[in-house]
């Protein structure tokens, strides 16, 4: 896996919208730190804070602030098909929101990567 751009504790205003109608073009990992609205492959979702998502390159997605501000940690990366398969075999649910009980530890790891 090759990590590209990384962001830690980014906060955006109520008008924030990130839109990838054809997908982000590479893998995108998000640690959502505030309530947010997502459109994931045409399905509307409301996510709570402490939700992780690991998007594949061609997954259509759009996300925005739910109430006031949107905050997240994130990184873009590329990986080989073998690396993706290894993560899937370890239980990584790509393109699927998942609550985490370890948000603080995960955020600290992303901060150290940045």
Predicted features and spans:
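Amphipathic alpha-helical segments enriched in hydrophobic/aromatic residues interleaved with Lys/Arg
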Residues: 88-114
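N-terminal regulatory/effector-sensing and dimerization cores
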Residues: 2-93
């Amino acid at each position: 896996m090759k990590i590209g751009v990384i962001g830690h504790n980014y906060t955006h205003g109520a008008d924030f919208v990130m839109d990838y109608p054809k997908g982000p073009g590479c893998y995108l990992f998000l640690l959502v730190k505030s309530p947010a609205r997502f459109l994931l492959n045409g399905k509307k979702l409301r996510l709570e804070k402490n939700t992780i998502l690991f998007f594949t390159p061609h997954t259509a997605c759009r996300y925005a602030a739910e109430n006031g501000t949107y905050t997240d940690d994130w990184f873009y990366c590329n990986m080989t098909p073998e690396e993706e398969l290894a993560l899937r075999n370890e239980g990584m649910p790509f393109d699927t929101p998942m609550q985490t009980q370890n948000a603080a530890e995960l955020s600290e790891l992303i901060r150290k990567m940045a």
